[in-house]
A protein has these predicted regions:
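Acidic/histidine-rich helix-loop elements
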Residues: 64-65, 72, 76
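Charge-dense, low-complexity intrinsically disordered segments
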Residues: 74, 183, 233, 281, ...
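N-terminal periplasmic/intermembrane-space "pro-region" immediately following the signal or transit peptide
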Residues: 2-64
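Short, basic, glycine/proline-bearing loop/turn elements
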Residues: 71, 123-124, 275-279
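Outer-membrane beta-barrel translocator domains and adjoining extracellular loop/strand segments
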Residues: 57-64, 111-118, 132-134, 165-170, ...
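Detector for outer-membrane/organellar transmembrane beta-barrel domains
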Residues: 64, 249-348
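Outer membrane beta-barrel
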Residues: 34-57, 75-215, 238-243, 247-255, ...
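Loop-centered beta-sheet repeat module
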Residues: 217, 223-271
């Protein structure tokens, strides 16, 4: 979208923010975002960006949650940020064939930075990035047979939960993306795979076949959030997953959506070190997610809400496998919860 959102606000504990008012696009799926800006032209270029300022009235110490009483009186801290700057590029080849891409610069791009790691007892750790990254978030080719039947292959957005399905900055009131879903799920969740989608009456559906997540990247702080990323030049695909999303628009101004995900995550990395043990003990690390979300946009009100629940099978065994990683391994050596839940609502 050709909108530039600038936020200059104080962020108080829960992340309450003010944004520049504009026409909401919350009814639009992120999976369609590139083509929605094509304007029926052969070649289309678009994009958006965010510049934010926030002040957080809580400690930035890595132990602020585990030892809350010791740091409850720490001073506040502020920061400027460029969470996302995105460039869209699409091309219509004709006869139902289209190509779409989305390049995203997060937090100012790449470089080198230091951060304090909770898992390393608060030690400084250097990352080969500048607190951000450059990602190819979408890159696909699509064949449209009709409004109700489209097939898409390539790198696609996985629309699990409200935030992933509607992640553009005018689709939430907070300065940053809502913390619940953004903490436990990959966000924006994008992987390489195949998608079948379409619109049937008042319903929009999408079914995806994807590579499974990597259990070695799960953690106690962020559950499966890092499971969709890869430290390699490719994405290991020893295991597979399916994702489903259905949205209903029967009531004017109201969108109701459900989404689900199921896939195995153990033995889905380079080398397949866990293959023998996983097979002998029938370990799968099955990730199961179910979500419900809604958006109401009418009568000068916008209301959004979501409820998400996820379960990880063989969670204790994931810890045993990650604990065997060497110190030079890019993976976590951490416990991970067997379940996670996020819920939220906003209105304005």
């Amino acid at each position: 979208m050709n909108n530039f959102k600038t936020l200059l606000t104080a962020c108080v504990l829960a992340g309450i923010g003010l944004s520049v008012p504009s026409t909401s696009s919350a009814q639009v799926s992120a999976a369609d975002s590139v083509m929605n800006h094509a304007n029926k032209q052969k070649l289309s270029v678009g994009g958006y960006g965010e510049v934010t300022y926030s002040r957080e009235f809580f400690s930035d110490n890595v132990y602020r949650y585990s030892k809350a009483s010791a740091y409850k009186n720490d001073p506040s801290h502020g920061k400027f940020d460029i969470p996302h700057a995105v460039i869209y590029l699409s091309y219509d080849f004709g006869k139902g064939w289209t190509m779409g891409s989305e390049i995203e610069f997060e937090h100012g791009g790449t470089g080198a930075s230091y951060e304090k790691e909770y898992e390393e007892s608060g030690e400084w750790e250097q990352e080969v990035e500048k607190g951000g990254e450059v990602e190819l978030e979408q890159f696909w080719i699509q064949k449209s047979f009709s409004r109700s039947l489209n097939v898409r292959f390539g790198h696609i957005v996985v629309p699990i939960g409200l935030t992933n399905a509607h992640h553009e900055p005018l689709n939430f009131f907070t300065v940053y993306r809502p913390e619940g879903e953004a903490t436990i799920f990959p966000c924006t969740w994008h992987q390489t795979g195949a998608s079948l989608w379409g619109v049937l009456g008042k319903f929009r559906y999408e079914v995806q076949l994807l590579a499974g997540l990597n259990a070695l990247s799960f953690s106690r702080d962020n559950w499966i959030q890092k499971g969709g990323t890869t430290a390699f030049e490719f994405e290991p695909s020893n295991k597979y997953a399916v994702a489903l999303r259905i949205d209903n628009y029967s009531i004017p101004g109201l969108r109701l959506g459900i989404s689900g995900y199921y896939g195995h995550s153990i033995d889905n990395s380079l080398g397949r070190e866990a293959s023998k043990e996983a097979n002998s003990r029938n370990l799968k690390g099955a990730v199961t997610i179910g979500t419900f979300d809604f958006t109401y946009n009418a009568h000068n009100w916008i209301v959004r809400g979501n409820f998400d629940y996820g379960h990880l099978g063989d969670a204790n065994d994931v810890r045993l496998l990650t604990g065997r990683q060497t110190k030079t391994s890019p993976f976590n050596r951490d416990y991970v919860g067997k379940a996670a839940m996020a819920t939220g609502i906003e209105a304005g």
